Amino acid sequence: MNKEMTHKKSNGIIEWIDYRLPIFSFFKHFSYYQTPKNLNYLWTLGSIAGIALVIQIITGVILAMHYTPHVDHAFESVERIMRNVNYGWLLRYTHTVGASMFFATIYLHIARGLYYGSYKTPRELLWHIGIIIFLIMMATAFMGYVLPWGQMSYWSATVITNLFSAIPLIGEPIVIWLCGGFSVDNPTLNRFFSLHYLFPFIIVALVILHLLALHQHGSNNPKGIDVKSTKDTIPFHPYYTVKDFVGFGVYFIIFAYFIFYEPNYLGHPDNYIPANPLVTPAHIVPEWYFRPFYAILRAVPSKLAGVFLMFGSIFVLFLLPWLDTSKIRSGNYRPIYRIAFWIFMADCLFLGYLGSKPPAEPYIIISRFSACYYFCHFLVVLPLIGKYEKPLPLPNEL
């Protein structure tokens, strides 16, 4: 009897709250949210990216409690976190490795969208919000890379901020505004720390918009055809929550391996040397997730042209819904596009390799060919394939 009264009382409280703030209805919606019944494990990447973002925010907030954004103390404060803060080494490695894992997840998420045509109507805005999230992620990661104030941090900040000086007329004022002076110094570090703390919460807001856009027309699927009836769908919970947990398990196994066995594998040893404005590293290398764009930047001798191509390589993704003229979404039914897609993937990986190499021959000339194909894929190959390709017959149902 007492248990029944307690249960009714708790239900009454939940109903009272839900009537005024429908948070319980919102979570209940996920139990009944209908999704295509044929989604594969690549569709767990969105949930994994959400987990990665939460990990980055939690570890970042705790690390910020112990970090000192000052050029004389930043490097020492990071070393203090590693040595004197309880589990500071774990927090830092979780945050740094987590950034790489986050980007790896997002790159796979984007690749899945490219292959299955998730950018096509009516999901153009969903795609655009995703690319905006990617851009802010890149800005956040770059600013975070500067914070340890090692040699690679300092000189990467110097190289990237000086890129804006290539813009005619307004370039120099932009550089001074970014740096807070005529060079990378204490004001730069303070600004980057402040923005690095702010941007993840902007990403959270954009993720909410991303989910709203996703729920408007539902998920795409491997066949790329629209849901025609309820027999083509199943509830998100428990069918896809179970699948997501399998993906989480694989993700955390890989994550744990890098944290505990290879925490510095994806970093650069020069960043364990305190920043010295008088000593330039022999080879300035960004983090691995920036290297394809870095290779495009260095592919041409003109600084302005390099900056234009580097930013253009990202902004061309915004035009993708209109550059791909095919009416078929999924690459499973587009034999020529499927070949072009894998060539493009290989080209992106090759650009990443070239971005890690010194700016000398033969890497420069090879970078030009690779960068040329990168843009040709979007501006030439996709429009032509969409016009002349004969797709395979689409199935009638999922």
Swiss-Prot record:
An individual GO BP term: respiratory electron transport chain
CDD domains tied to this protein = cytochrome_b_C, Cytochrome_b_N
Keyword list (alphabetical) reads:
Cell membrane, Electron transport, Heme, Iron, Membrane, Metal-binding, Respiratory chain, Transmembrane, Transmembrane helix, Transport
Q: Which cofactor does it need?
A: heme b
What does the record give as the function of this protein?
Component of the ubiquinol-cytochrome c reductase complex (complex III or cytochrome b-c1 complex), which is a respiratory chain that generates an electrochemical potential coupled to ATP synthesis.
Q: Which PANTHER family match?
A: CYTOCHROME B (PTHR19271:SF16)
What assembly does the database describe for this protein? The main subunits of complex b-c1 are: cytochrome b, cytochrome c1 and the Rieske protein.
**Per its record, how is this protein called by name?**
Cytochrome b
